[in-house]
Amino acid sequence: MAHKKAGGSSRNGRDSESKRLGVKVYGGQAINAGGIIVRQRGTRMHPGENVGMGKDHTLFALTDGHVNFSTKGAAKKHMVNVVPAAV
């Protein structure tokens, strides 16, 4: 009789789903109020003018305008600002 031995089992073979972190709107691009600018773990970038921070450290626009990235201080902190659109 033809037989096939049982295949082994493995406890590996899993991976977590990617979290899609990173910059969503780049410098100079237009953004509406409430739009997400950066998704991040921890404060790699800090909120500046017209930018709010969610409880998961997501940076979002508080007003309509254009996104601007800059550094601040001796520690060269990365700041994210929204320059309001001219009315």
Swiss-Prot record:
The keyword Cytoplasm does not apply. Pfam families: Ribosomal_L27. It comes from the Bacteria. Keywords: Ribonucleoprotein, Ribosomal protein. Residues 1-21 are annotated as: Disordered. The keyword Transmembrane does not apply. One of its GO terms (biological process) is translation. GO terms for cellular component: cytosolic large ribosomal subunit. PROSITE patterns: RIBOSOMAL_L27. One of its GO terms (molecular function) is structural constituent of ribosome. PANTHER family: LARGE RIBOSOMAL SUBUNIT PROTEIN BL27M, RIBOSOMAL PROTEIN L27. Belongs to the bacterial ribosomal protein bL27 family. HAMAP family: Ribosomal_bL27. This is Large ribosomal subunit protein bL27. It comes from Paraburkholderia xenovorans (strain LB400).
